[in-house]
Amino acid sequence: MSSLRQIAFYGKGGIGKSTTSQNTLAALAEMGHRILIVGCDPKADSTRLILHAKAQDTILSLAAAAGSVEDLELEEVMKIGYRDIRCVESGGPEPGVGCAGRGVITSINFLEENGAYEDIDYVSYDVLGDVVCGGFAMPIRENKAQEIYIVMSGEMMAMYAANNISKGILKYANSGGVRLGGLVCNERQTDKELELAENLAKKLGTQLIYFVPRDNIVQHAELRRMTVIEYAPDSVQANHYRNLAERVHNNGGKGIIPTPITMDELEDMLMEHGIMKTVDETQVGKTAAELAALSA
């Protein structure tokens, strides 16, 4: 087996990051690789499809019950799922109280100190991407994750989040050695989505690792708390995830330091593809009805 690779999946909330990452990791496990998933999202949904569970008990919740994280054993926080994938969720505090990023820092330190990274080929961090606080940036900042894969779509805010995450990677690239592995486009069936994803990847100086087509079988599998790889292994969609896993596996050492763009450049790109029209400043703030009346 190859030496340990530490990767991370970042992306805008609701983009399908956890679903995409779990299917990709299930495919990597199917290929014979030994996997550890570290969920870094307060929703604690980064391992549910691997474990067939609603939500795994988190390190922070177990530490609170035990007294402190030092009172925990590795076996208490780590669960074994599909294809022997090891699963851990960092968790976060109650809503409105404390820093959710604290769970990420506490968890990774605990796992390192207790030998969780031994005898594995991949550690994968599944990280909330809308929030740029230090806790969530920790896998990047502390050189825990060496390859970042950004899950996005052709929607403007998903691309905006991808660009913001690239800014975070750029900030720590020289001090920590983290690199952008590429973009993964999770299709939302928006206009010219593939073209936009490829164009954004080009502007960021990276590659579109894979374009994952939209398929209802993903939702069917999720309702049963399963990956498509396990639920429908012979399906076309399962093969897409296998292809994505193969691309990630063959991408080791090929990451780049990204070249983020400005908001104006992002809007210009949308205009170039006809998604946004050039807006006259006099039209800003006008409703569709008001604009129709002006042009009548």
Swiss-Prot record:
Cofactor: [4Fe-4S] cluster
Highest taxon in the source lineage: Bacteria
Thylakoid among keywords: no
Cited InterPro entries: NifH/chlL_CS, NifH/frxC, Nitrogenase_Fe_NifH, P-loop_NTPase
The UniProt record lists the keyword Nucleotide-binding: yes
A GO BP entry: nitrogen fixation
Top enzyme class: oxidoreductase
Chain sites annotated for binding [4Fe-4S] cluster: C99, C133
EC number: 1.18.6.1
Subunit annotation: Homodimer.
Protein family: Belongs to the NifH/BchL/ChlL family.
Listed name of the protein: Nitrogenase iron protein 1
Organism for this UniProt entry: Azorhizobium caulinodans (strain ATCC 43989 / DSM 5975 / JCM 20966 / LMG 6465 / NBRC 14845 / NCIMB 13405 / ORS 571)
